[in-house]
């Protein structure tokens, strides 16, 4: 599986998103693509890429035929579309649901199945979270080339997050961090809880005294 840079995967995610959500504006000009990459909504992290940054990555992806220049006729403005998957000669074939899940992971980073169900609504339909989990399990099932990885649960969270693996070991590093939370962090939480319990005990004792005084009167 080809390993992409963070900028490349942001560009691919934006092209996938805009192809589905605003087909009348697709393919995208360089200016529109840069704007999409730097959106403040539906992006994590928020970036401040320049046209030059985007164009450098676009040119690399064009050389590898992952993006094509769709400039037509006498137009002087280049327009770009992705060929990330489901192409005639490409090996990567994805369903609408699989593509939507990967698109959100490309643009927003690690997500829980519940978050993915909510955040893919403009891209495809999921009847329930179980359907999202099935898609994620399918994307992670290929032992030779898994597309996503399940991260360990964060402390206090009910659901584990999933991350894509198209940027290689970056996502693996996240998984390692999540699997080994520091003992000092756990100790701080325990101390805070013990302090809260002690405060509650004092309040209960004060209330008992107040009630006894009222009864004596």
Curated annotation (Swiss-Prot):
InterPro entries: DUF480 (IPR007432), WH-like_DNA-bd_sf (IPR036388), WH_DNA-bd_sf (IPR036390). It comes from the Bacteria. It holds the Pfam family DUF480. Gene3D superfamilies: Winged helix-like DNA-binding domain superfamily/Winged helix DNA-binding domain. Belongs to the UPF0502 family. This is UPF0502 protein VF_A0604. It comes from Aliivibrio fischeri (strain ATCC 700601 / ES114) (Vibrio fischeri).
